[in-house]
Structures are given as C-alpha cells and as structure tokens.
Amino acid sequence: MADNDAYAPVDTPMGPVFVAWNDHGVCRVEPGTDAARFEAAFNDQFGRPVTRSDGPPPTSTADPDAPVDWRGVPPFDRAVLTAIRAIPPGDAWTYGEVAEAIGKRGAARAVGGALGRNRVPVIVPCHRVVAAKGLGGFGLGLDAKRALLAAEGYPAVADQGRLLP
C-alpha cells in the first residue's frame, strides 16, 4: 500500500517550514523555502518521493493532537517525543524532567539525543525542553527555539541562553 506522502509550506513563528504527511500522520517538518531540497531530503530519509499538495496540511502545526507517523522511531525516542507533547504552550520542562516523566531518571543526555532526532519539530514541541541552567540546544538553531518559545508566551530568553523570570 502506498503511503500517499504529500507536503506543503507553512508559516511558523520561526519562519517558513515544509510539513510532510501521509496516511499515518505527519512524518517530517523542516525549515526552508527550497522545495527541491526538501523533496530530495525526504527521499533520502524515507526512500520514496513526496508530492507537493495543492492545499495545506490536514493538521495545524499548533495542534497538540496532530497525528504523527511514528513508524521507524525507536521505542525510547517515541517515549520521549510522546511525553513532551504534554508540555503546554508557554511552559517548558528540563531534559531531566522529561527523563523522569518516562521513568528513566538520570537519562537527561539520552533525552537530548532523542529530541535531536525528532523529525517533526514544532508538531512534537522539542523546543519546550530546556537545560536546567539555560536554553539548551535545538536542532533548528537557538534563534528558532527562542522565536517559538516567545510566540507561545514563554518568559524572555537572554542572548546567552539563560532563562529570565
């Protein structure tokens, strides 16, 4: 059975992204405006082509219940990514808090690794996970993380990555 992969450009607080989906849910989110580059990267990742849709994605990037295509995501990563979907906009958890939430106390670094492999950022809000003493990392860059957090009403973030009250 074909996956019916499609994609469309979407504007977000961090700038334009491409959102790809199929019959199983959203499968890839990537910033940019170069459709040919996105299509090539999708094909490299999934081994199949993706077609540009004439319409928008079937779900909003702000929908916390948007279906996600979890196929191929390792169990630990899926546990992390599922857990962070519970973080409401305007809030954040530390890497350690996420580890505790999935019953893996002391696995903060492993949580960071799972977040770095998140192929659907924004849909699965890895930007809402921060370091205990600062902003932490973000696969799409710290400017994007700041923009997403600010758009959701999170407390101000200083240039050095420290969180401000």
What are these regions (language model features)?
Residues 1-106, 155-165:
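Basic nucleic-acid-binding alpha-helical/helix-turn surface characteristic of O6-alkylguanine DNA
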Residues 109-118:
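Regulatory, non-catalytic segments
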Residues 117-122, 137:
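Short, solvent-exposed alpha-helical "recognition" segments
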Residues 122-129:
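Short Lys/Arg-enriched helix C-cap and helix-to-coil transition segments
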Residues 133-165:
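…primarily DNA-binding HTH/wHTH and HhH modules…
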